[in-house]
Amino acid sequence: MNVNLEEILDIYENIIYKNSRNKNKLYNFEKNKMSILYDLCYKLNNNIYDIGKYNIFLIKYPKYRIIMSLSVTDKIVNHYVTIKYLIPVLSKYLDNRNIATRKNMGTDYGIKLIKKYIEINKKYDKFYILKLDIKKYFYNIDYVVLKNMLVDYFEENVYDLLCKIIDSTDEEYINTRINVIKSNVNSNKVNDLPCCEQYKSLPIGNMTSQFFAIYYLSGLDHFIIHNLHLKYYIRYG
């Protein structure tokens, strides 16, 4: 890889620093910021970077979810590979009706599409809107399938880094921590919170996870739109 300090510093200052809610993390990072970033560049350029452990916690709004939060350094890498590699290389394979977490798209764009589709179909006496949801989608993303979808598009060192990110939840401490959280919450809602199966599941919250999720079912999007000819279609997630 050819990672330069300016790119890494820009991601930290304009994305991580501005959007992080954990000010203690930032405070500790700031004390040795430049030395940490120099070290990170060295590790990435020499293919010796490894992902640290996740901070795993529960959120209750808008619904109960397990969140896995990376360290500041790992968040920088996560954003870097998404911005530098995933989006530029893979976006051309995504249909514009696949709208989640994409620039100039998202929920507002989805609402516009729905309104447009309804107006178009008002010429018919009757039409239907079908809404489907994939249960525990992020937890059911298969590592092997996802890696096979990536391997032909990236150089070996970039692909290896992407695989490290994908594999980062395949660790025993993850489920141990999830089970501790569930045991400490007095609510039936935690019963539906899944643990991570071996070779499956992406952490909710990572930028890479968000992009992997929209890319993972891109083949399904094309099948529905072009093979089934269902052109009034939107996928969010």
Question: Where are the predicted features?
Answer:
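Non-catalytic, polymerase-adjacent accessory regions of viral genome-replication enzymes
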Residues: 1-46
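Non-catalytic, well-ordered alpha-helical scaffold segments
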Residues: 6, 34, 38, 74-79, ...
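Glycine-/proline-rich flexible loop or hinge segments
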Residues: 16-27, 57-68, 95-97
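Active-site-flanking structural segment that lines cofactor/substrate pockets
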Residues: 35-64
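Conserved pre-motif C helix in the palm subdomain of viral-like polymerases
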Residues: 63-96, 196-227
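Active-site-proximal segment of RNA-dependent polymerases
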Residues: 82-142
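Conserved polymerase palm-domain catalytic core
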Residues: 122-236
